[in-house]
Structures are given as C-alpha cells and as structure tokens.
Amino acid sequence: DIKTYGNYMYVGTEANRADPDTLAETGQVYKLPQGIQVVDLTNPENASLVYEWDGVVQSHNIMEADGYLYVIGSNQQWSHDGEQQSWGLDDLIILDLESNPSMPIKVGGWSGEYLHDVCIKNDILYGCGIYSESIIAFDISDKFNPQLITQWYGIPSSHACWISDDGNTLFSASET
C-alpha cells in the first residue's frame, strides 16, 4: 500500500518475509522490503528512499490521517506450507509523521485481533475484523492510547469500510 504526506511517500508491503530472498520469473533475486519505507518526493524525478521503519515484518494496509500513519494487519506471515504465523505484535500501529515525516516514530497501538482495513472520522477509527466477522470502533483522540469503544459482530468477511461525510452511516464491504 502507498500513502503520501507532504513531500514523503510511505510504502507498506505484505510480501512474505519467511524467505527474504525471492527468485522471480526472470531469474533475478530480489531483496524484499522491510517494514514501512519512506521515500522523499521533494524532487520526484529523483525520488529517494530515506528511511525504513522496521517496527513490523509486514503490513496489509496503511492509512494517513491528520499527520499520523496507521499501519494495519501487521506482522501476520504465511509460511511455505500455508500455515499462518503471528509475532503477536500490534494489530494497529500509529506512527507520528508530523514531528519528523522522514523518520516516523511509533506513538501508539492496539493488540487484539487482525484488522484488514480502516477508516477514520472525527477521531473514531473503524476497523474491519475480517476473521472475527466484525467492525471495531476505537477512540483515537489520544494517539498514544487508543481505546476500544465497541465491536459489532455478524459482518461476514468484513473487508473494507468507509464512513459517510456526515458521519452517520458506516458502509462495509465483504471480501466474498
């Protein structure tokens, strides 16, 4: 996933890190990226990687809102035999971009269950709990300490969500 903030681009990857060197069809060996990559776009013709935040193995999704980067679905990894492995780290990670956009730092997070996608409105973060078939709402007014507000169940394959402009309706899409 890719998001921008100011003159910087943030790149997350869901590449399997069980084997960091992957042989491509071309016969070339590629080193898979780590964590969240930060690219300086001040001069787009000569964009350059300036930092790699290595606080996660991988991320399914990233979202920028109000100077913070939200890393979602992190540290889930699939082994070569298809078994899911988890490092038990944060399922929601909040990085401060405002203080130093070229070198974000973790300020908060939440561990509980895998989140597949999120949307944010008025300091409320709505997360899709795809495996628990739910939508989870968090108060993120204190980025250092997000608080679980509620969890709505019965939403099969909760894949993506979005809140209406007026904040009165939450839309959810299923992955099936």
Where are these regions (language model features)?
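Feature marking well-ordered beta-strand scaffolds used for ligand recognition
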Residues: 1-176
